[in-house]
């Protein structure tokens, strides 16, 4: 009698080098995040034209941007449990179709009220796409490279935002703001069919859901041709936590860690958004020109890609909580130091670059940390809820920034205050690292689909 093989999917992925199929999955993930970044950045590029054509105020533009951010938060919060129930691929493809459709609809807006509604609907799709593609890619990444791979795909956000800027510089003068919105919708609608064809469902999700062995085997044969025989009986480890995805995220085993992830990401996005939005206004108030303010803000954002790659690299080499805590701490210190460099444009630019690299990089690294923390059956929910709570921080940053401007605080006081959320990110990571670093899967198994799916 031929002996039945019982391969461990987790170990199979971990012991093999990256295959061509895994690299394709990473590339597709990068593209989804890039489309997300392009679409989210669009409003910033069309805002000056809208003010001229429609005569809208900054307050009205702020409402449109806030509507999109609220949609992003809700899309993230509700999509995670759906992805843990229906599958990552279905949610990703539908969300890409969804935000593509509503972005095209936005191009036909006739007033601010219509645009607010359309951007809210767009935000729902954008919020669903980003955390779930991160979850799917993480489940195909070897654990030794998982953090770096996740930060690589999230670098697609800055790539997409930059592509939006270059597109805007040519399209808007030639064809108007509607053309940029149309492009932002057409690209995801064209890309979604490619995802249907090329993107696989997470093999670890299929294991948890006890999918047919033939379907799992087909994906594994694309990953590692010749390593999986037809005579295979897959098994599943005992569940690391009981209940559905939402109960697992909020359970005694994972609840404290979830709260710390939410705290850190809330404060991290609060910091990045408040600096990205209000930095030009702050530096203009201390005598710098509009051109200098724009250059310094661009330098602040440019540091994010380098910082993200460094964060992922460091997380794969030392304790990830320590790695992110150090990076957030450095970012907070350099942010506070900016308050004492008002007299030197060159020094402010240097400090802004390091601050942006650290804060943006650490925020990207949080996606890798959440993917490492949760088991497969709750990973999409855990990561998406972290994104949703973080987006609330981004929304509140707009109001906090306006309040600080209204108080006419001294330049250095504003940056010292921003040291508080930075300190809270470090404290949250330290607490999670001490009390909820992670929960390895239970070793025992029960008959089902595939073993090692965590």
PLM region descriptions:
Residues 74-112:
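Conserved MFS/SLC helix-loop-helix module at the cytosolic interface between two early adjacent transmembrane helices
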Residues 1-15, 198-257, 440-454:
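Intracellular cytosolic loops and amphipathic helices of Major Facilitator Superfamily
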Residues 1-38:
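Cytosolic juxtamembrane N-terminal segment immediately preceding the first transmembrane helix
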Residues 145-173, 187-188, 387-397:
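Glycine-rich segments within core transmembrane alpha-helices of 12-TM secondary carriers
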Residues 55, 87, 108-114, 125, ...:
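Helix-breaking motifs and short loop linkers at transmembrane-helix boundaries and internal kinks
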């Amino acid at each position: 009698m031929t002996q039945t093989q019982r391969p461990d999917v987790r170990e199979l992925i971990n012991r093999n080098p990256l295959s061509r199929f895994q690299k394709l999955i990473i590339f597709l993930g990068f593209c989804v995040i890039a489309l997300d970044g392009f679409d989210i950045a669009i409003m910033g590029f069309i805002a000056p034209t809208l003010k001229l054509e429609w005569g809208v105020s900054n307050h009205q533009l702020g409402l449109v941007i806030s509507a999109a951010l609220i949609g992003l938060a809700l899309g993230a919060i509700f999509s995670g449990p759906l992805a843990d129930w229906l599958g990552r691929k279905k949610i990703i493809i539908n969300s890409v179709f969804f935000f593509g459709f509503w972005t095209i609809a936005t191009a036909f807006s006739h007033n601010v009220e219509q645009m607010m509604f359309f951007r809210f609907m767009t935000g729902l799709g954008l919020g669903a796409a980003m955390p779930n593609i991160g979850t799917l890619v993480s489940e195909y990444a070897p654990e030794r490279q998982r953090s770096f791979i996740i930060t690589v795909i999230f670098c697609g956000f800055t790539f997409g935002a930059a592509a939006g800027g270059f597109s805007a510089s040519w399209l808007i003068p030639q064809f108007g703001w509607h053309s940029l919105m149309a492009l932002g919708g057409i690209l995801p609608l064209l890309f979604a069919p490619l995802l249907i064809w090329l993107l696989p469902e997470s093999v670890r999700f299929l294991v948890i859901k006890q999918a047919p062995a033939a379907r799992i085997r087909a994906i594994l044969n694309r990953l590692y041709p010749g390593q999986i025989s037809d005579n295979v009986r897959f098994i599943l480890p005992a569940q690391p936590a009981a209940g559905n995805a939402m109960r697992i995220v909020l359970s005694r085993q994972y609840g404290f860690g979830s709260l710390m992830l939410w705290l850190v990401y809330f404060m991290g996005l609060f910091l990045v958004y408040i600096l990205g939005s209000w930095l030009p206004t702050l530096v203009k108030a201390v005598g710098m020109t509009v051109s200098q303010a724009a250059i310094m803000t661009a330098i602040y954002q440019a540091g994010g890609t380098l910082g993200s790659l460094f964060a992922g690299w460091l997380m794969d080499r030392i304790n990830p909580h320590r790695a992110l805590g150090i990076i957030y701490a450095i970012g907070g210190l350099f942010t506070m130091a900016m308050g004492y460099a008002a007299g030197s444009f060159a020094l402010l630019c240097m400090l802004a670059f390091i601050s942006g690299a650290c804060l943006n990089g650490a925020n990207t690294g949080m996606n890798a940390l959440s993917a490492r923390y949760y088991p497969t059956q709750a990973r999409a929910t855990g990561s998406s809820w972290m994104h949703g709570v973080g987006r609330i921080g981004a929304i509140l940053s707009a109001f906090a920034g306006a309040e600080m401007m209204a108080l006419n605080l001294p330049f250095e006081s504003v940056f010292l205050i921003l040291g508080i959320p930075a300190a809270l990110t470090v404290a949250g990571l330290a607490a999670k690292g001490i009390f909820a670093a992670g929960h390895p899967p239970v070793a025992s198994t029960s008959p089902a689909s595939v073993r090692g799916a965590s």
